[in-house]
Amino acid sequence: MGSKIVVNNYGSFDVKMAYGQGSTCYDVDGKKYIDFLAGIAVNSLGHNFKPLVDAISAQAARQIHVCNYFLSDVGVEFAEKLLKATGFSSVYFGNSGAEGNEAAFKLARKYGYLNGGEKRRTIYTLESSFHGRTLATLTATGQEKFHPACFAPYAEHFKTIKPNDWKAIKT
C-alpha cells in the first residue's frame, strides 16, 4: 500500500488516508476515522477548516515562500503581533519543533559561554521528554528508546534529570 516505499519515523498502520473534514478523516476506501492525534498535535483547527484554507490559498496566490535572506510583509506583520502579545523584543521563525529546539540549544550554549565559558554549556532536559528527531534533539530527548547505538555518537553536554531535581542542576 505504500508502507514499503515511504520511509517513516514510526511503525505505520496499513491505512491510506484520502481527506479530512474537521476531526474526521477518511481513507481511500471511504472508511471514517476520528482523528484523535490531530496530525500529531499540529492540526488543532481540524482538517479543511475553511478560514485556514482560504488564508493559505490567498497567501499562496501572492507568494509561497521567501528565503530568509529577505523579510516578507506578512512575516513582519506576524512578528509584530507576536511581540505585542508576548512583550518580547524579537522572534525566531523556524520550520519545525526540532528546528526551534536546535535554535534554543544554540542560544542557551551561547549564553552559557558568554557568561561562564566552557563550564556553562550543559543543557538539562527532563526524563520522558521528547524534543525532535535531529541528532541534538534526540540527545536531549529523555527516553532511552530514542537513543539507539546506530545513531551514535550523540551530542555532548546534555544531561537528563528527573522533574524538580534541583540538586542535579547544581552539581
Residue ranges and their predicted role:
Residues 1-21, 38, 161-162:
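Active-site-adjacent loop/helix segments that line or gate small-molecule/cofactor pockets in enzymes
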Residues 1-3, 53, 57, 152, ...:
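Generic detector of well-ordered alpha-helical segments enriched in charged/polar residues
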Residues 17, 48, 74, 161-164:
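Short secondary-structure boundary/capping elements
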Residues 6, 13, 33, 41, ...:
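Glycine-rich, flexible loop/turn motifs
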Residues 27-28:
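Short, acidic, Ser/Thr-enriched surface-loop or helix-capping motifs
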Residues 32-118:
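Glycine-rich loop-to-alpha-helix module at the N-terminal edge of alpha/beta enzyme cores
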Residues 80-171:
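PLP-dependent aspartate aminotransferase-fold enzymes
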